Swiss-Prot record:
Keywords: Cytoplasm, Lipopolysaccharide biosynthesis, Nucleotidyltransferase, Transferase. It comes from Pseudomonas paraeruginosa (strain DSM 24068 / PA7) (Pseudomonas aeruginosa (strain PA7)). This is 3-deoxy-manno-octulosonate cytidylyltransferase. Belongs to the KdsB family. One of its GO terms (cellular component) is cytosol. Coiled coil: none annotated. The gene is kdsB.
Amino acid sequence: MTQAFTVVIPARYASTRLPGKPLQDIAGQPMIQRVWNQARKSAASRVVIATDDERILAACQGFGAEVLLTRADHNSGTDRLEEVASRLGLAADAIVVNVQGDEPLIPPALIDQVAANLAAHPESAIATLAEPIHDVAALFNPNVVKVATDVNGLALTFSRAPLPWARDAFAGDRDSLPDGVPYRRHIGIYAYRVGFLADFVAWGPCWLENTESLEQLRALWHGVRIHVADARETMLPGVDTPEDLERVRRVLGG
């Protein structure tokens, strides 16, 4: 029997490139409702939206979601997740999946996959997903986070830089991917064991996390194991810019 899990969707109003992003209309529904709809199609026993904004709270209540108003001073999404897990009274061995509030096209199967992967790997406190990188532009794009894993699928590190650096190949040609190097892009969906979240918050950010602006590096810094599996379905890009929003509107608006 598959272990039950809870989905938490963080939603912040503030956004440098797209203010009020969770409330942007997509084919008649606010984006946060689109994400919530996808999460409810998963096997999650509970789907909760977490926001620090009264406008988002009201919108979510309007379409019938379970929603919590959280503190506004969290350093990261995982810190916010810990508050939610604590307020919901989730057990230390429970699994919670963090689904980003700007992923209206997220496949429900990936939510189920990351939760099942964590349940199947008791040595890990976190599970996440990745997919192959097929073009050199993505490899050199700092907005595409790269991940390297060991033989057991455990993360060695994450970076915005090309990872690993193909020393010999890139000494000459940087216009194509080197042969035989399985470059992978990290997909930002996580499953956590609830008992780990309090430790994560108590540690506070480390210099490596701050340098790359990647909070998962805090876990690796403290020796926490992160299991990384190849996504079973394609993860379409989320919404970061007005251009992304128009693209998603075209997809969902027919």
